[in-house]
């Protein structure tokens, strides 16, 4: 398993819980919410939110021994680093490694970040 700035349950944890009550009411009424992030707008449908609630994983244990590699930017302001740490806890039997990228943001799109990602993927595949 490779997680890059992983955000399971992001609809609830990173969107719904941060909305004000009036925004939640409007979301429920219109059946969608226009999320603004980093200069972009994303249409989040209510059906997507409800589907995400059916697929929660952070309250379970995954007893697989598959290797778990997580990489997370230290300056990620979209997904908190504590979420990657929480992911670690759901894999009690796995061999785990987390790399925190100094200066890395959520996209990890600097050339050095992309090289680091490519090297990690190559290690897992080969």
Task: Enumerate the language-model features and the residues they cover.
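Catalytic histidine neighborhood in serine/cysteine hydrolases
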Residues: 91-107
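Short alpha-helix in the alpha/beta-hydrolase fold that links the catalytic acid
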Residues: 66, 80-89
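Acidic catalytic loop of the alpha/beta-hydrolase fold
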Residues: 75-79, 106-108
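Short beta-strand/loop motif that positions the catalytic acidic residue
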Residues: 63-64, 70-72, 76
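Active-site nucleophile elbow and catalytic-triad environment of alpha/beta-hydrolase enzymes
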Residues: 41-61, 66
